[in-house]
A protein has these predicted regions:
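N-terminal, positively charged/glycine-rich alpha-helical extensions of SAM-dependent methyltransferases
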Residues: 1-28
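A C-terminal cap/extension of S-adenosyl-L-methionine-dependent methyltransferases
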Residues: 103, 202, 211-265
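A short glycine-rich, Lys/Arg-flanked "PGG" loop and its adjoining helix->strand segment in the class I
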Residues: 140-152
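Acceptor-substrate binding/catalytic loop of class I
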Residues: 160, 180-199
Length: 265
């Protein structure tokens, strides 16, 4: 897999993560879905992997690449892990640092990109990268950098979207384009930047990361019921926070839309 061309990368709206004001933690803003809908699944999966490898929180350093407003980083820090978050957006980092202080959490936030991580080799026991890989222009470089900063035996946990017909309909058409159900900003995701499982497996192998598994991600309700909730959210009858609490994301045997996985250095 190669670096995304400029004409495709320029279509994506990454500026949503760089808006004025504390958007990340507001119940009436789309980014709140990370907290209410996706975080419980991501944290639960990560803890399962940690337990599998008998990882001890107080002695384990975790880096979140693309931490945004710190929603996932805070959950990891609450578990007792030594937590660092990195993001290219100064405004997101400002929001993250402010909320961490209010929550009495010690988290090290730094500005930077996944393509050029400002850390020494072999710095972290764990790297997390959730809903980020499909936003970067140079995915091979990001994976290379993640491998570089991971300690030997370290774990890389990630989730992303598969590039399939089903993901195009659900994540692009329904969530972003078709007004009856769309609840996400236009161009939040660009389908051509979605990543097939075999593509990321190949990149992991090239960068000395031993791929272990992929698990699909799906809602724990029927898609018909989810469409009803989407319609209510699109019509303003539910806040993003209320929508995100209507159902859970769970593991699936199908990786056709979203998937999560990990690799070991």
């Amino acid at each position: 897999m190669q670096k995304v061309t400029g004409d495709i990368y320029n279509q994506i709206n990454n500026e949503i993560y760089n808006l004025e004001g504390d958007k990340w933690w507001r119940p009436d803003f789309s980014l709140n879905l990370i907290k209410t809908l996706y975080n419980p699944f991501r944290v639960g999966y990560s803890i399962e992997v940690f337990e599998r490898f008998k990882i001890i929180p107080g002695k384990t350093s975790v880096l979140e690449v693309g931490c945004g407003g710190g929603i996932l980083s805070e959950e990891i820090a609450r578990k007792g892990f030594i937590t660092t978050g990195i993001d290219p957006s100064e405004l997101s980092l400002k929001s993250a640092a402010s909320h961490a202080r209010e929550s009495n959490l010690v988290i090290n936030y730094e500005k930077g990109t996944g393509e050029n991580l400002p850390f020494e080799d072999n710095s972290f026991n764990v790297v997390l990268c959730c809903d980020v890989l499909e936003h970067v222009q140079d995915l091979p470089k990001v994976i290379s950098e993640i491998s570089r900063v991971l300690k030997i035996g370290g774990i890389f946990i990630y989730d992303t979207f598969n590039r399939t017909y089903f993901s195009k309909i659900s994540a692009i058409k329904i969530l972003q384009e078709w007004k009856r159900w769309s609840i996400m900003p236009p161009k939040l995701h660009v389908w051509q930047m979605f990543i097939k499982p075999d593509e990321i497996k190949s990149l992991l192998h090239e960068n000395h990361l031993d791929w272990k598994e992929h698990r699909g991600i799906k809602p724990n309700i029927s898609y018909l019921k989810m469409l009803r909730y989407l319609r209510k959210r699109a019509a303003g009858k539910l806040t993003y926070e209320e929508f995100g609490k209507k159902f859970l994301m769970v593991k699936s045997r199908s990786t056709q839309i979203m998937y999560i996985g990990y690799a070991v250095k």
